[in-house]
Amino acid sequence: MSAPEKPRERSFPKIEFTDSEAGAKEFPSSKSRSYSYFTPAKLRATMYEDVTVDVQPDPDRHLTQGWIYGFGNGPGGYPKDWTTAKSSDWHAFRDPNEEWNQTIYRNNAAVVRQVELCLKNAKRARVYDGWNSTWLTFIERNVGAWMHAENGLALHVFTSIQRSGPTNMINTAVAVNAAHKMRFAQDLALFNLDLAEATEAFDGSAHRAVWQEAREWQATRKVVEELTAVGDWCQLLFATNIVFEQLVGSLFRTELIMQIAARNGDYITPTIVGTGEHDYDRDLNYTRNLFRLLTRDPEHGEANKALFTEWLGIWVPRCLDAALALQPIWSAPADKAVTFASSLDAAKAKFTALLEEIDLDIPEELNK
Protein backbone atom coordinates (compact mmCIF):
# COMPACT_ATOMS: atom_id res chain seq x y z
CA MET A 1 0.00 0.00 0.00
CA SER A 2 1.48 3.32 -1.11
CA ALA A 3 1.89 6.16 1.33
CA PRO A 4 -0.74 8.88 1.08
CA GLU A 5 0.35 12.00 -0.77
CA LYS A 6 0.96 15.04 1.32
CA PRO A 7 -1.45 17.88 0.58
CA ARG A 8 0.24 20.56 -1.50
CA GLU A 9 0.78 23.83 0.19
CA ARG A 10 -0.91 26.73 -1.56
CA SER A 11 1.38 29.59 -2.39
CA PHE A 12 0.45 33.23 -2.31
CA PRO A 13 2.22 36.05 -4.10
CA LYS A 14 4.37 38.09 -1.84
CA ILE A 15 2.88 41.43 -0.95
CA GLU A 16 5.00 44.30 -2.15
CA PHE A 17 4.28 47.89 -1.22
CA THR A 18 4.82 50.29 -4.09
CA ASP A 19 3.85 53.47 -2.21
CA SER A 20 1.02 54.02 -4.69
CA GLU A 21 -1.73 52.81 -2.39
CA ALA A 22 -4.03 55.06 -0.43
CA GLY A 23 -2.47 56.22 2.82
CA ALA A 24 1.11 55.50 1.77
CA LYS A 25 2.21 59.10 1.97
CA GLU A 26 2.01 61.00 5.21
CA PHE A 27 1.54 64.75 5.28
CA PRO A 28 -0.20 67.29 7.54
CA SER A 29 -3.83 66.24 8.03
CA SER A 30 -3.32 62.98 6.09
CA LYS A 31 -4.87 61.07 9.01
CA SER A 32 -7.85 63.39 9.20
CA ARG A 33 -11.15 62.18 7.78
CA SER A 34 -12.00 65.77 6.81
CA TYR A 35 -8.85 66.52 4.82
CA SER A 36 -9.45 68.56 1.66
CA TYR A 37 -7.26 68.69 -1.43
CA PHE A 38 -8.29 72.28 -2.16
CA THR A 39 -7.96 75.54 -0.27
CA PRO A 40 -11.42 76.73 0.79
CA ALA A 41 -12.40 80.36 0.28
CA LYS A 42 -13.02 80.77 4.01
CA LEU A 43 -11.73 79.04 7.13
CA ARG A 44 -13.80 75.91 6.50
CA ALA A 45 -15.00 74.39 3.24
CA THR A 46 -18.70 74.82 2.60
CA MET A 47 -21.03 72.12 1.32
CA TYR A 48 -21.01 73.93 -2.04
CA GLU A 49 -17.22 73.64 -2.27
CA ASP A 50 -17.23 70.00 -1.17
CA VAL A 51 -19.55 68.98 -4.01
CA THR A 52 -18.20 71.22 -6.80
CA VAL A 53 -14.46 71.87 -6.42
CA ASP A 54 -12.29 69.40 -8.38
CA VAL A 55 -15.32 67.31 -9.36
CA GLN A 56 -14.55 68.12 -13.00
CA PRO A 57 -11.10 66.70 -13.89
CA ASP A 58 -8.23 68.92 -14.99
CA PRO A 59 -4.71 67.82 -16.04
CA ASP A 60 -3.38 70.87 -14.19
CA ARG A 61 -4.84 69.58 -10.92
CA HIS A 62 -4.41 65.99 -9.76
CA LEU A 63 -5.03 64.42 -13.20
CA THR A 64 -1.33 63.73 -13.72
CA GLN A 65 -1.85 61.08 -16.41
CA GLY A 66 -3.66 63.57 -18.67
CA TRP A 67 -7.15 63.24 -20.10
CA ILE A 68 -8.43 59.68 -19.87
CA TYR A 69 -11.10 60.14 -22.53
CA GLY A 70 -11.77 62.29 -25.58
CA PHE A 71 -12.95 62.33 -29.16
CA GLY A 72 -10.90 60.38 -31.68
CA ASN A 73 -9.71 63.38 -33.68
CA GLY A 74 -10.30 66.13 -31.16
CA PRO A 75 -9.06 67.49 -27.85
CA GLY A 76 -9.73 65.56 -24.68
CA GLY A 77 -11.85 66.72 -21.80
CA TYR A 78 -12.47 70.44 -21.33
CA PRO A 79 -9.92 72.44 -23.37
CA LYS A 80 -9.11 75.90 -22.08
CA ASP A 81 -8.93 77.23 -25.65
CA TRP A 82 -12.71 77.04 -25.94
CA THR A 83 -12.49 80.71 -24.98
CA THR A 84 -9.96 83.41 -25.84
CA ALA A 85 -10.11 84.73 -22.26
CA LYS A 86 -7.22 83.57 -20.07
CA SER A 87 -6.81 82.89 -16.38
CA SER A 88 -3.81 81.87 -14.30
CA ASP A 89 -6.18 79.82 -12.13
CA TRP A 90 -9.69 79.07 -13.36
CA HIS A 91 -10.27 77.07 -10.16
CA ALA A 92 -10.16 80.23 -8.05
CA PHE A 93 -13.73 81.07 -9.07
CA ARG A 94 -16.48 80.45 -6.53
CA ASP A 95 -20.17 81.14 -7.06
CA PRO A 96 -21.24 83.63 -4.35
CA ASN A 97 -24.73 82.07 -4.51
CA GLU A 98 -23.18 78.66 -3.72
CA GLU A 99 -25.50 76.93 -6.18
CA TRP A 100 -25.27 73.18 -6.69
CA ASN A 101 -27.60 70.32 -7.61
CA GLN A 102 -29.75 70.52 -4.49
CA THR A 103 -30.24 74.28 -4.52
CA ILE A 104 -31.37 74.26 -8.17
CA TYR A 105 -34.41 72.15 -7.29
CA ARG A 106 -35.06 73.74 -3.91
CA ASN A 107 -35.00 77.36 -5.10
CA ASN A 108 -36.84 76.73 -8.37
CA ALA A 109 -39.52 74.70 -6.57
CA ALA A 110 -40.12 77.63 -4.21
CA VAL A 111 -40.57 80.01 -7.15
CA VAL A 112 -42.91 77.58 -8.93
CA ARG A 113 -45.11 77.40 -5.82
CA GLN A 114 -45.16 81.20 -5.63
CA VAL A 115 -46.22 81.57 -9.28
CA GLU A 116 -48.86 78.84 -9.04
CA LEU A 117 -50.36 80.41 -5.91
CA CYS A 118 -50.37 83.86 -7.55
CA LEU A 119 -52.17 82.61 -10.67
CA LYS A 120 -54.63 80.52 -8.65
CA ASN A 121 -55.57 83.49 -6.47
CA ALA A 122 -55.92 85.73 -9.54
CA LYS A 123 -58.39 83.33 -11.17
CA ARG A 124 -60.36 82.84 -7.96
CA ALA A 125 -60.69 86.61 -7.46
CA ARG A 126 -61.45 87.16 -11.18
CA VAL A 127 -58.74 89.80 -11.31
CA TYR A 128 -58.47 89.70 -15.10
CA ASP A 129 -62.05 90.95 -15.51
CA GLY A 130 -60.96 94.37 -14.30
CA TRP A 131 -58.17 94.84 -16.83
CA ASN A 132 -58.89 97.16 -19.74
CA SER A 133 -58.46 95.99 -23.32
CA THR A 134 -55.43 98.23 -23.89
CA TRP A 135 -53.50 96.55 -21.08
CA LEU A 136 -54.56 93.06 -22.18
CA THR A 137 -53.25 93.83 -25.67
CA PHE A 138 -50.00 95.11 -24.17
CA ILE A 139 -49.53 91.87 -22.20
CA GLU A 140 -50.44 89.52 -25.05
CA ARG A 141 -48.04 91.25 -27.44
CA ASN A 142 -45.04 92.29 -25.37
CA VAL A 143 -44.83 90.04 -22.33
CA GLY A 144 -45.66 87.16 -24.67
CA ALA A 145 -42.90 88.21 -27.07
CA TRP A 146 -40.36 88.46 -24.23
CA MET A 147 -41.13 84.83 -23.42
CA HIS A 148 -39.43 83.87 -26.71
CA ALA A 149 -36.30 85.82 -25.77
CA GLU A 150 -36.08 84.06 -22.40
CA ASN A 151 -36.66 80.65 -23.98
CA GLY A 152 -34.02 81.28 -26.66
CA LEU A 153 -31.43 82.31 -24.08
CA ALA A 154 -32.28 79.29 -21.92
CA LEU A 155 -32.07 76.62 -24.61
CA HIS A 156 -29.54 78.00 -27.08
CA VAL A 157 -27.22 80.13 -24.95
CA PHE A 158 -26.85 78.88 -21.39
CA THR A 159 -27.77 75.24 -21.97
CA SER A 160 -25.36 75.05 -24.90
CA ILE A 161 -22.36 76.26 -22.85
CA GLN A 162 -23.08 74.74 -19.44
CA ARG A 163 -20.41 72.06 -20.08
CA SER A 164 -17.90 74.28 -21.88
CA GLY A 165 -16.13 75.92 -18.93
CA PRO A 166 -12.81 74.57 -17.61
CA THR A 167 -14.09 74.02 -14.04
CA ASN A 168 -17.16 72.53 -12.44
CA MET A 169 -17.76 75.71 -10.43
CA ILE A 170 -18.22 77.75 -13.63
CA ASN A 171 -20.30 75.10 -15.37
CA THR A 172 -22.60 74.59 -12.38
CA ALA A 173 -23.30 78.34 -12.17
CA VAL A 174 -24.10 78.46 -15.90
CA ALA A 175 -26.34 75.38 -15.60
CA VAL A 176 -28.30 77.09 -12.82
CA ASN A 177 -28.55 80.18 -15.05
CA ALA A 178 -30.07 77.97 -17.77
CA ALA A 179 -32.55 76.49 -15.29
CA HIS A 180 -33.59 79.99 -14.19
CA LYS A 181 -34.22 81.13 -17.76
CA MET A 182 -36.09 77.96 -18.67
CA ARG A 183 -38.36 78.15 -15.65
CA PHE A 184 -39.07 81.86 -16.18
CA ALA A 185 -40.00 81.26 -19.84
CA GLN A 186 -42.35 78.47 -18.73
CA ASP A 187 -43.89 80.76 -16.10
CA LEU A 188 -44.64 83.35 -18.78
CA ALA A 189 -46.15 80.63 -20.97
CA LEU A 190 -48.36 79.46 -18.09
CA PHE A 191 -49.44 83.06 -17.48
CA ASN A 192 -50.32 83.42 -21.16
CA LEU A 193 -52.43 80.25 -21.07
CA ASP A 194 -54.26 81.35 -17.92
CA LEU A 195 -55.14 84.70 -19.45
CA ALA A 196 -56.35 83.06 -22.68
CA GLU A 197 -58.66 80.80 -20.67
CA ALA A 198 -59.88 83.57 -18.36
CA THR A 199 -61.00 86.14 -20.93
CA GLU A 200 -61.95 86.04 -24.59
CA ALA A 201 -60.44 89.51 -25.08
CA PHE A 202 -56.95 88.02 -24.72
CA ASP A 203 -55.38 86.40 -27.79
CA GLY A 204 -53.05 83.72 -26.46
CA SER A 205 -51.38 83.12 -29.83
CA ALA A 206 -50.57 86.74 -30.74
CA HIS A 207 -47.08 86.59 -29.20
CA ARG A 208 -45.76 84.33 -31.95
CA ALA A 209 -46.54 86.77 -34.77
CA VAL A 210 -45.27 89.70 -32.69
CA TRP A 211 -41.91 88.00 -32.07
CA GLN A 212 -41.54 87.04 -35.72
CA GLU A 213 -42.93 90.12 -37.46
CA ALA A 214 -43.50 93.17 -35.22
CA ARG A 215 -40.99 95.88 -36.12
CA GLU A 216 -40.24 96.89 -32.53
CA TRP A 217 -39.14 93.35 -31.61
CA GLN A 218 -37.03 92.44 -34.63
CA ALA A 219 -33.82 94.06 -33.36
CA THR A 220 -34.15 92.15 -30.07
CA ARG A 221 -34.84 88.93 -31.94
CA LYS A 222 -31.80 89.56 -34.14
CA VAL A 223 -29.49 89.99 -31.13
CA VAL A 224 -30.81 86.82 -29.47
CA GLU A 225 -30.24 84.84 -32.68
CA GLU A 226 -26.75 86.33 -33.08
CA LEU A 227 -25.93 85.30 -29.52
CA THR A 228 -26.78 81.69 -30.31
CA ALA A 229 -24.13 81.69 -33.06
CA VAL A 230 -21.22 82.60 -30.76
CA GLY A 231 -18.83 79.71 -30.12
CA ASP A 232 -16.71 81.26 -27.36
CA TRP A 233 -18.44 80.38 -24.08
CA CYS A 234 -16.92 83.29 -22.15
CA GLN A 235 -17.90 85.83 -24.81
CA LEU A 236 -21.41 84.39 -24.85
CA LEU A 237 -21.70 84.74 -21.08
CA PHE A 238 -20.29 88.28 -21.21
CA ALA A 239 -22.50 89.43 -24.09
CA THR A 240 -25.64 87.98 -22.50
CA ASN A 241 -25.38 88.68 -18.76
CA ILE A 242 -23.26 91.84 -18.89
CA VAL A 243 -24.52 93.61 -22.03
CA PHE A 244 -27.85 92.24 -23.32
CA GLU A 245 -29.49 91.73 -19.94
CA GLN A 246 -28.50 95.22 -18.79
CA LEU A 247 -29.41 97.20 -21.90
CA VAL A 248 -32.42 95.17 -23.11
CA GLY A 249 -33.57 92.67 -20.48
CA SER A 250 -33.57 94.93 -17.43
CA LEU A 251 -34.81 97.83 -19.56
CA PHE A 252 -37.94 95.88 -20.46
CA ARG A 253 -38.52 93.99 -17.22
CA THR A 254 -37.40 96.45 -14.53
CA GLU A 255 -37.75 99.86 -16.12
CA LEU A 256 -41.06 99.19 -17.91
CA ILE A 257 -43.12 96.23 -16.66
CA MET A 258 -42.29 96.61 -12.96
CA GLN A 259 -42.92 100.38 -13.12
CA ILE A 260 -46.21 100.61 -15.00
CA ALA A 261 -48.14 97.39 -14.27
CA ALA A 262 -49.60 98.50 -10.94
CA ARG A 263 -50.67 101.85 -12.41
CA ASN A 264 -52.71 99.87 -14.94
CA GLY A 265 -54.42 97.79 -12.24
CA ASP A 266 -52.17 94.75 -12.70
CA TYR A 267 -50.51 93.20 -9.65
CA ILE A 268 -50.07 89.75 -11.19
CA THR A 269 -47.56 90.49 -13.94
CA PRO A 270 -45.03 92.18 -11.59
CA THR A 271 -45.13 89.13 -9.32
CA ILE A 272 -44.24 86.80 -12.19
CA VAL A 273 -41.74 89.11 -13.86
CA GLY A 274 -40.24 89.79 -10.43
CA THR A 275 -39.19 86.15 -10.17
CA GLY A 276 -37.19 86.56 -13.37
CA GLU A 277 -35.64 89.75 -12.01
CA HIS A 278 -34.65 87.93 -8.82
CA ASP A 279 -33.09 85.14 -10.89
CA TYR A 280 -31.08 87.62 -12.95
CA ASP A 281 -29.88 89.38 -9.80
CA ARG A 282 -28.46 86.07 -8.55
CA ASP A 283 -27.01 85.21 -11.95
CA LEU A 284 -25.37 88.62 -12.14
CA ASN A 285 -23.62 87.89 -8.82
CA TYR A 286 -21.65 84.97 -10.22
CA THR A 287 -21.07 86.74 -13.56
CA ARG A 288 -19.64 89.79 -11.80
CA ASN A 289 -17.34 87.62 -9.69
CA LEU A 290 -16.07 85.68 -12.70
CA PHE A 291 -15.23 88.68 -14.86
CA ARG A 292 -13.76 90.60 -11.93
CA LEU A 293 -11.49 87.60 -11.37
CA LEU A 294 -10.43 87.70 -15.03
CA THR A 295 -9.80 91.46 -15.21
CA ARG A 296 -7.76 91.34 -11.98
CA ASP A 297 -5.78 88.25 -12.95
CA PRO A 298 -2.09 88.92 -12.12
CA GLU A 299 -0.86 87.35 -15.36
CA HIS A 300 -3.63 87.91 -17.93
CA GLY A 301 -5.64 90.80 -16.46
CA GLU A 302 -4.63 93.49 -18.95
CA ALA A 303 -5.08 91.19 -21.95
CA ASN A 304 -8.53 90.22 -20.67
CA LYS A 305 -9.51 93.88 -20.28
CA ALA A 306 -8.52 94.55 -23.88
CA LEU A 307 -10.48 91.48 -25.00
CA PHE A 308 -13.61 92.47 -23.07
CA THR A 309 -13.38 95.99 -24.51
CA GLU A 310 -13.46 94.42 -27.99
CA TRP A 311 -16.54 92.43 -27.00
CA LEU A 312 -18.20 95.61 -25.73
CA GLY A 313 -17.51 97.21 -29.10
CA ILE A 314 -19.36 94.34 -30.79
CA TRP A 315 -22.38 93.92 -28.52
CA VAL A 316 -23.13 97.36 -27.06
CA PRO A 317 -24.18 98.89 -30.44
CA ARG A 318 -26.35 95.86 -31.24
CA CYS A 319 -28.08 95.91 -27.86
CA LEU A 320 -28.57 99.68 -27.98
CA ASP A 321 -30.24 99.29 -31.38
CA ALA A 322 -32.52 96.64 -29.86
CA ALA A 323 -33.32 98.91 -26.91
CA LEU A 324 -34.12 101.91 -29.12
CA ALA A 325 -36.35 99.79 -31.35
CA LEU A 326 -38.52 98.97 -28.31
CA GLN A 327 -39.36 102.64 -27.74
CA PRO A 328 -42.93 102.46 -29.21
CA ILE A 329 -43.89 99.97 -26.50
CA TRP A 330 -43.65 102.70 -23.85
CA SER A 331 -46.54 104.53 -25.55
CA ALA A 332 -48.86 101.51 -25.69
CA PRO A 333 -50.36 101.37 -22.13
CA ALA A 334 -53.25 103.61 -21.17
CA ASP A 335 -51.42 104.86 -18.07
CA LYS A 336 -47.89 105.86 -19.07
CA ALA A 337 -46.11 106.13 -15.71
CA VAL A 338 -42.58 106.39 -17.15
CA THR A 339 -40.98 107.69 -20.33
CA PHE A 340 -38.65 105.72 -22.56
CA ALA A 341 -35.89 108.29 -22.08
CA SER A 342 -35.94 107.95 -18.28
CA SER A 343 -36.04 104.15 -18.50
CA LEU A 344 -33.10 104.03 -20.91
CA ASP A 345 -31.09 106.44 -18.75
CA ALA A 346 -31.69 104.22 -15.71
CA ALA A 347 -30.60 101.11 -17.63
CA LYS A 348 -27.46 102.87 -18.89
CA ALA A 349 -26.60 104.04 -15.37
CA LYS A 350 -26.82 100.48 -14.00
CA PHE A 351 -24.77 99.18 -16.93
CA THR A 352 -22.10 101.83 -16.30
CA ALA A 353 -21.93 100.90 -12.61
CA LEU A 354 -21.56 97.22 -13.51
CA LEU A 355 -18.67 97.92 -15.91
CA GLU A 356 -16.92 99.94 -13.20
CA GLU A 357 -17.31 97.03 -10.78
CA ILE A 358 -15.47 94.70 -13.17
CA ASP A 359 -12.80 97.33 -13.94
CA LEU A 360 -13.78 98.05 -17.56
CA ASP A 361 -13.90 101.43 -19.30
CA ILE A 362 -17.25 102.82 -20.39
CA PRO A 363 -17.67 102.31 -24.17
CA GLU A 364 -18.08 105.44 -26.29
CA GLU A 365 -21.14 103.96 -28.00
CA LEU A 366 -23.09 104.21 -24.75
CA ASN A 367 -23.17 108.02 -24.83
CA LYS A 368 -23.81 108.55 -28.54
Curated annotation (Swiss-Prot):
SUPFAM superfamilies: Ferritin-like. Residues 1-17 have a biased composition (Basic and acidic residues). It is an enzyme of class 1 (oxidoreductase). InterPro entries: Ferritin-like_SF, MP_mOase_hydro, Phenol_Hydrox, RNR-like. Induction: By acetone. Transcriptionally activated by MimR. Its EC number is 1.14.13.227. Coiled coil: none annotated. Keywords: Monooxygenase, NAD, Oxidoreductase. It catalyses: propane + NADH + O2 + H(+) = propan-2-ol + NAD(+) + H2O; acetone + NADH + O2 + H(+) = hydroxyacetone + NAD(+) + H2O; butan-2-one + NADH + O2 + H(+) = 1-hydroxy-2-butanone + NAD(+) + H2O; phenol + NADH + O2 + H(+) = hydroquinone + NAD(+) + H2O. Residues 1-32 are annotated as: Disordered. It comes from the Bacteria. GO terms for molecular function: oxidoreductase activity, acting on paired donors, with incorporation or reduction of molecular oxygen, NAD(P)H as one donor, and incorporation of one atom of oxygen. The propane 2-monooxygenase multicomponent enzyme system is composed of an electron transfer component and a monooxygenase component interacting with the effector protein MimD. The electron transfer component is composed of a reductase (MimB), and the monooxygenase component is formed by a large subunit (MimA) and a small subunit (MimC). Requires the presence of the chaperonin-like protein MimG to ensure a productive folding, resulting of a soluble MimC, which leads to the active form of MimABCD. Belongs to the TmoE/XamoE family. Component of the propane 2-monooxygenase multicomponent enzyme system which is involved in the degradation of propane via the O2-dependent hydroxylation of propane. Also involved in the degradation of acetone via the O2-dependent hydroxylation of acetone. Also able to catalyze the oxidation of phenol, methylethylketone (2-butanone), 1-propanol and 2-propanol. This is Propane 2-monooxygenase, hydroxylase component small subunit. It comes from Mycolicibacterium smegmatis (strain ATCC 700084 / mc(2)155).
